[in-house]
Amino acid sequence: MTSNGSQPQASTPMVSAEEPAAAASVPNSTPMVSAEGPAAAVSAPNSSVVSSAPASAPTASEPVISQVQSLAPIVSGFDPNLHGRLTNEQMRQAQNEAAMQGYEEGSRRNPRLPSSTTAHNDYASMNSNPFETGTAYGGAPRVSFGSYPTFPGSGSASEPNSQRIFPQQHGVNPPAHASDLVPHQATSGGNTGTPFTLGNRAPRNATANTGGMRRRLDSVGLKNIRYEPQAGVVASNQKIRAVGVALIGMGIPEHQLTEVGVYLARHCADVGASDKSALLGTFPGSDITLEEVGTMIKQTEGCTLRQYCAFYAKHVWNLMLQTQSPPANWVGKEFKFETRYAAFDFFFGVESTASLEPADGLIRLPTQAERVANATSKEIQMYRIRSMEGTQAVNFGEVTGGKIGPKPVLSIRK
């Protein structure tokens, strides 16, 4: 109580947001929030200070407390239970602001997308040839990851080379028209030997045999003998190469010799592959007739037309299965519907190891019913041929009896 009768006001220290802990230990005082920090946390009054205050203390500080409480809602997102931590709403708002700032910075740094003209040029550089291996876009590296990948610098994509990967299959033959006819054989480990080559003739003055005929070979020695399958009913690589030289002389491009052979063999599957078969028509887009090519084949290296067609029998088999077109005369040869694809006379070349193997192998093997049907048809054809031939050496009526020959016996009836 002052001399003028007025009651002195209690001192109320101001708590700054920078020093929140300093005001907590001040006795007989009420904390106050500074307006400088709108986001600062306000600590509750000390309970010990409140309990130590006299009961007869004046209530002059009550308006101050109400002002402190009234300031609390002014703080954005104030929650006295968080004690200075951010609320979920404030955290979401901060994350959104950071994401928006990062998006703006990224859009300023990244270059713009290519124009439609550039995209049109990229699509214009696409390779439209469906038979060419490699990637479709011109800007990409020319590597094909299909069944037979090719690599840069490996030559033409339509010709086999050392960089192309082919599956190891039974009866794989090298390209017959290539200069090197040594098939690629995989070797395992470092146990690789020198391939077997005979060389020129040895001197004939050898007087002793030291057991060269009885020398036993191990697996490495056997692997060095790279044998090329040969069959008398299938044209050899030497004959195929000679035929190729003759066809090139006729004006057929070298890179289309295989296509010409497959097309001719497919035609012979319809009309027959004997020397008496009449070949009809011309090759697509050309004035070269099939009869010309067939005659050239018969006149080269003693190769028959059936041997030449049997060399491409596996390709003809795949072609008929892909196009679902069996030989045209399968009904006339009395084949059933289930065995119609075996109704051609060089069917034996489909499973021969001497015939040219397709790059991806056979679509399927012939069934046992197809094998039996083809063998039976072949026996019937031989029976009919023998029926038209006679065995008499003279033409006297007493000998022939007006008959061409004795009645043949069909062997399949025995």
Curated annotation (Swiss-Prot):
Disulfide bonds: none
UniProt keyword terms in alphabetical order: Capsid protein, Helical capsid protein, Virion
Matches recorded under Pfam families: Flexi_CP
Entry protein name: Capsid protein
An example Gene Ontology molecular-function term: structural molecule activity
Compartment(s) where it occurs, according to its Swiss-Prot or TrEMBL record: Virion
InterPro entries according to UniProt: Pltvir_coat
Database matches in PROSITE patterns: POTEX_CARLAVIRUS_COAT
GO cellular component: a single term: helical viral capsid
Polar residues biased stretches: 1-14, 113-127, 153-166, 185-197
Top-level lineage group: Viruses
Biased composition (Low complexity): 15-27, 38-60
Region described as Disordered: 1-60, 94-127, 148-212
